[in-house]
């Protein structure tokens, strides 16, 4: 039975046209060489980005003008297969002995024709953070020493829309922004004492005080709010998202940073997982059969009150075209003066109000489920980019309603003894649109039970099975699931991270 499950997964992946010719490039590129800077910004679609598999030169056979994650190690032929909407071959890193950190599993597949290329991007890195105080007064870095810093593990999924530029840029630079934000915290995070209230104005100067010698909590006011090390890391991640979004705004014209992207990022640092989500990608932990949600979707429905409050406070953002109020359906002119159900930014329930002329405007939030939209345009309310997004046939900008700040949840790995079958699953909405949490947990149990606990390929096989299960198989009426419902026609990207980590006997 176990062998049949393995062979079935292998057959499905190979029949989809998975690349068999991959380049022999070594392990992941190191992400610690330089901070975010102008020279690291996205290049045009015809140039090769530094942290992506880039487009080959034009040949008589074909021209490929898109990129996939470096760790896939795709050859030019593999890039063409990955870009094939008809075959929709599942792509995973090659089994060459150099695996992703923590034996992480990864799989992806292109959409069924929704966009020209796969607009998802992914990143998996081990990043070293050196304290700013380890630099001399002249700014020259001393010899790196792990006594001066620490490493964090990093995974990121970026689901692009209206083009792949924002997702590609975020996949190459967001972890660098996070590293920059953590540089101020190296000594503080190593110190068991509570964080200081203030930092010195010029870190790294001779004679600068240690973290415990900085401004005393009692020297300013009392009592002081309790600030934990966790909250400092969360703040660093939040600021990094904001700085990444600002960089996209500055450089969107010169570097063709088109569209926007949802971002789902995981950091492993000092024994804890930090899961940051801005968009409609999701993460869950499957632990001993238990499902632990580690994120939530940010859509016009889930953030209705935040959007309505902004529209209420700044009506100029709505122009004369939209109303911040929500009605069960579009108000008709013949209903002027009647009392109709509505709700505003302060309400979770419904009430009646007299319909006025302003209520005839289009609602700021409309639709339900996957069809919910902000200003009749976009179905996500958090993410990076979208600085040029405007309402159709209008000059109204939608960006003010879109937040770049993620929600960050923390999971302490030291509080539970994890077994080889305990995993963190990250997926773009292409997975979750057709697969619920229970189905993912069932797939985790089915696939992992067919492999030995110390087999590192089991997590890649699981990622492939999740992608295949969401994609379905081609039939006369499109891609179909076993129950004959439509499979996902979107790009699908999945990370499977074993929670045992690098120190476990099976990683």
UniProtKB/Swiss-Prot annotation:
Location of the region described as Disordered in the Swiss-Prot/TrEMBL record: 1-102, 197-220
Q: Which UniProt keywords apply?
A: Hydrolase, Phosphoprotein, Protein phosphatase
Gene Ontology molecular-function annotations:
protein serine/threonine phosphatase activity
- What positions does the domain PPM-type phosphatase occupy? 103-499
Q: Quote the catalytic activity from the record.
A: O-phospho-L-seryl-[protein] + H2O = L-seryl-[protein] + phosphate; O-phospho-L-threonyl-[protein] + H2O = L-threonyl-[protein] + phosphate
- Residue ranges that the Swiss-Prot or TrEMBL entry lists as coiled coil: none
Sites of the modification Phosphoserine?
Answer: 65, 75
Annotated InterPro entries: PP2C, PPM-type-like_dom_sf, PPM-type_phosphatase-like_dom
Q: Which domain of life is it from?
A: Eukaryota
Compositional bias, Polar residues, is annotated for 59-73
Query: List-wise, which residues carry Phosphothreonine?
Result: 41
EC class name: hydrolase
Q: In which tissues is it expressed?
A: Specifically expressed in the testicular germ cells.
Q: Where is the composition biased (Low complexity)?
A: 14-23, 199-212
Which region is the signal sequence? none
- Enzyme Commission number, as recorded: 3.1.3.16
> Is this entry keyworded Nucleus?
no
Family statement: Belongs to the PP2C family.
Q: Summarize the subunit comment.
A: Interacts with UBE2I/UBC9.
Name of the protein described by the UniProt record: Protein phosphatase 1J
**Source species, please?**
Mus musculus (Mouse)
